[in-house]
Amino acid sequence: MFRAVLVGISGFLTLASNAQKFESLAQTPPMGWNSWNKFACDGINEKVIREMADAMVASGMQQAGYRYIVIDDCWQVGRDSAGNIIADAVKFPGGIRALADYIHSKGLKFGIYTCAGTKTCAGRPASLGYEYQDARQYAAWGVDYLKEDWCNTLKGQNAPASYTLMRDALYKAGRPIVFSLCEWGSNKPWSWAEDVGHLWRSTGDISAVWNTPANPDGSPRSGSVLGNMDLENGLEQYAGPGHWNDPDMLEVGNEGLSVDESRAHFSLWCMLAAPLIAGNDLRNMSDDTRAILTNKNLIAIDQDPLGRQGYRVSMKEGLEVFVKPLQGGDTAVCLLNRGDQEKQLDFAWKEYGIGSGHSIKDLWKDRQTGTTDTRFRGTLGRHQVIVLRLSN
């Protein structure tokens, strides 16, 4: 069967002109919650997912812009005699459609997970050879967002072809579904996925760690806030409305990051125009976690309709400066101290190509703080950020 599948995949280009993705979706980076970072495989069930939807509303996250509740791996257990995917009846006794209906009743959207290989990363049934059948099932269930992973693929399986096949299947099924590609940047999806999906992973998996050692050749290594962020450098040209680089889900609120590190993590993802997919337990958030995830000033930077991904303009002795052009001529600036020592800031804006005449708003302090006519001075503690909005 898999030989036939590969033959079918290899011929996808002849059909590409007759298929497309849902172009109107994800005009700004998707915002939501995914189960994996906190609950992994064993922790998910119908009760947990319903409670996450309730908490997204009650916590103010929905009002802040979060929309998607996404079940990651381990919701599926097999296929019936007709090949239809079967959900785990123990974990999800009410069924997936009823769960989707509940989430929709909250004014939220529902997402689910699959894999392009023979099995998912956790060894559950995947979609290889069942793309059109699964897409029809997702549409019937009321799915609004699909994450497709890249585990257990066949030798020689072609990533662009495989993901294009699922794109076509989703489009034919007729329900607008945001398509999230998750092949960890292994096949440089930024170079081919703009017309395939709405977002693509550009890094390996993240964890709740501030930094990871570089690879032997000096290149960044994923698995941390800074490692995943560094891997975004140079990819800004590929992001825009409807097609986003994805440095992986947020670890804000998960054990392992300090409050300062969580604030920096969130700030950097907003500067990168990254999808804001929370990965913590929404039912038990600290005040600090809630304040970070719902900060209206930072979310406005991420969701800016111009859709430009921010980029690094300076990196010197552990101090990094990022800029992000915004609609209407404003500019967001992020100052990051990635090092372990406090830094004293004292610079002229022209050092970073920014002219005079701009008013400055400190987005975390939520207050105006001068203009670019004078030197910027301040203190930046270890692993801290200052995020500023410059306006004409």
What label would you give each PLM region?
Residues 30-35, 65-72, 109-114, 144-149, ...:
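Structural recognition of the beta-strand scaffold that forms the well-ordered cores
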Residues 9-18:
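Hydrophobic h-region of N-terminal signal peptides that target proteins for export
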Residues 269-272, 277-279, 315-354:
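Carbohydrate-binding surface patches
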Residues 38-41, 52, 56-155:
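Aromatic-lined carbohydrate-binding/catalytic grooves of carbohydrate-active enzymes
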Residues 264-313:
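Catalytic cores of secreted or luminal carbohydrate-active enzymes
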